[in-house]
Amino acid sequence: MDKKQSLKTAAYEVFSKKGYKATGISEIARQAGVAVGSFYNYYESKEAIFLDIYIDENNRVRQAMIEELDWEIDMIDLIGQLFAQSRTLVSSNKILAEWYNPAIADELHSYYSSEEGKVANPFHQFLVKTFTNRMQAEGYSPEKIQDILQVYNLFY
């Protein structure tokens, strides 16, 4: 395993146990078996490695949601299930629950609301494609679909 992957693995373990605020770079480096100075060859800050960990964890959890939900049910019911499952999975996951932590929330929200974050987010792309296809199949006009997707983008 290379040093960057060792740092990510260690950071995942430490953040999962202690949370964002109580975790320090020195502890991550020690757990990874690398010098603190080496940490900065791969990440510029604790925020940067946490964002990397958060993105991976979010993608993993959201992929599980894609596989578990029935995407063919009524759209209103589907949206309700989507929100309920998201709440459950986020609140039970120490890393994803940091979304609400003022110490890191701005960084997370900024990334996910950016164009880069949306393009790089497979779950976002899946939802846009899935809901667009469903609305087309149900006879929504292209203008109505666009309006609905604009509202979706306000929330996502």
What kind of region is each of these model predictions?
Residues 1-2:
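N-terminal intrinsically disordered/low-complexity leader segments
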Residues 6, 10, 14-48, 52:
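Helix-turn-helix
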Residues 10, 14, 85, 89, ...:
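Amphipathic alpha-helical interface segments
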Residues 17-21, 93, 138:
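Short coil/turn segments at alpha/beta junctions that flank glycine-rich nucleotide-binding fingerprints
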Residues 46, 53, 57, 61, ...:
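Hydrophobic/aromatic residues within well-ordered alpha-helical segments
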Residues 52, 56, 66-92:
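Hydrophobic alpha-helical connector segments
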Residues 62, 109-139, 146-150:
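Amphipathic alpha-helical packing segments from all-alpha helical-bundle domains
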Residues 88-112:
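Amphipathic alpha-helical segments used for helix-helix packing
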